[in-house]
């Protein structure tokens, strides 16, 4: 489970896609504050690529960019906020939210942490490495992730989901590595900054794991939650 927890069971494909679009629109809006040109705005370029891979309609994508760049005259201001704490059984996690109302979000996150423990800033961040995370799939069966990591400038790599590879980078190298991976035989599926646990919790029973997953799913269902990084082995 490690770096990033993902919901295992989506209720419906349409709802799942709608939620993905909602998260991407917020991310695009924030990124576009630094300019609407993807050629000069690396963060925006990364998120736009993710939106295209998710088949976001062009109209939705363009509107989000213009909204973030202030070209539509709208005043909605999104803020990125990070919460730290523990899931049941002292599993550390970092929760990233994007919200237009911080007071509302923190109150609702406190409620969501009822069965866990919401901590102060820095309470678990020390137990994670801040890294770039690039999920990429091999173009051919013989593509070598170790060689690709070395040649592209990644710090490390690990097996991802469905045959993909997760390449880990220094945060400042994220854009350069994701640009270099296609030359090494890998198609980039997503690229972002995230947190890698240093000491993931292991040895939980099936019952304990079920409690942790139920807690995480409840958090993930919150509209303002963009990402969760969980110190859980498996």
UniProtKB/Swiss-Prot annotation:
Q: Give its localization.
A: Cytoplasm
Q: Which GO terms describe its molecular function?
A: DNA binding
Q: Does the keyword Secreted apply?
A: no
Biological process (GO) annotations held by this record are: regulation of DNA-templated transcription
InterPro entries xref list: Integrase-like_N, TACO1_YebC-like_2nd/3rd_dom, TACO1_YebC_N, Transcrip_reg_TACO1-like, Transcrip_reg_TACO1-like_dom3, YebC-like
Keywords, A to Z, come to: Cytoplasm, DNA-binding, Transcription, Transcription regulation
Name any GO cellular component annotation.
cytoplasm
Sequence similarity: Belongs to the TACO1 family.
HAMAP family given for it?
Transcrip_reg_TACO1 (MF_00693)
The protein's name is Probable transcriptional regulatory protein Pfl01_3677
């Amino acid at each position: 489970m490690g770096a990033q927890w993902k919901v295992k069971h989506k209720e419906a494909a349409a709802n799942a896609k709608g939620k993905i679009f909602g998260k991407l629109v917020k991310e695009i809006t924030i990124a576009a504050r630094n300019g609407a040109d993807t050629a000069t705005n690396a963060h925006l370029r990364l998120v736009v690529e993710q939106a295209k891979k998710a088949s976001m309609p062009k109209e939705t994508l363009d509107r989000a960019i213009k909204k973030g760049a202030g070209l539509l005259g709208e005043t909605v201001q999104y803020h990125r906020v990070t919460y730290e704490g523990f899931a049941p059984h002292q599993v550390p996690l970092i929760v990233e939210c994007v919200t237009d109302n911080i007071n509302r979000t923190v109150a609702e996150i406190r409620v969501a942490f009822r069965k866990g423990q919401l901590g102060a800033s820095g309470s678990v961040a020390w137990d994670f490495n801040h890294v770039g995370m690039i999920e990429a799939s091999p173009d051919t069966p013989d593509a070598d992730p170790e060689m690709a990591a070395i040649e592209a400038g990644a710090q490390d790599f690990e097996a991802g989901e469905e045959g993909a590879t997760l390449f880990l980078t220094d945060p400042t190298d994220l854009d350069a590595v994701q640009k270099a991976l296609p030359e090494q035989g890998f198609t980039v599926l997503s690229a972002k900054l995230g947190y890698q646990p240093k000491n993931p919790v292991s040895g939980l029973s099936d019952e304990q794991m079920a409690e942790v997953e139920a807690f995480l799913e409840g958090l993930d269902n919150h509209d303002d939650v963009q990402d969760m990084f969980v110190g859980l082995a498996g």
